[in-house]
Amino acid sequence: MILQLQQKYFTIGGDKFNITDENGTPVYQAKEIFFKLRGNAHLYDVQGNEICFMEAKILSWFGQYNIWAREGDTTPLGIFKGTFYPVPFVKRWRLDYMGKKFVVKCGPYNCKVFPSDDNWKYDKKHMAGHIHKRLLKIRDTYKMDFDESALPPQIAAIITLWFDTAFHNNQH
């Protein structure tokens, strides 16, 4: 399955946009809020019901994003946590979302997602998804190509939204 996220380049106060499938049908809606100390984003279903709220943790050595069911909750649904990775221009993140674990390796314009076991070990040959930031487009565009059996669409949308929030928010 393919999900596509398209945003406007210039917005004031936040950006609301659709996440569509390969046919252009809206599957999710998202909203990013830029003028806050911490980067955050909301993910909604097509009817406008909030699925999750993502918020950056300020004091974290390699970076951390908490995923909540809604703003103000006390127990997170999931956590994106950065880890040490000695390769230049590549960052490795761990996603633990509702008991499912993934290792996410990101460069400046692409991201690879691997399913992981409880010890964060993964097989490099079995990639669950791949995100590309599409260059030379009128709108800020991300394309997530993923295997639905290894990576549920909701988690794929969360990872795509996180990739934009964590790596490309300062470009708006």
Language-model-derived ranges and their functions:
Residues 1-172:
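Intrinsically disordered, low-complexity proline/glycine-rich segments
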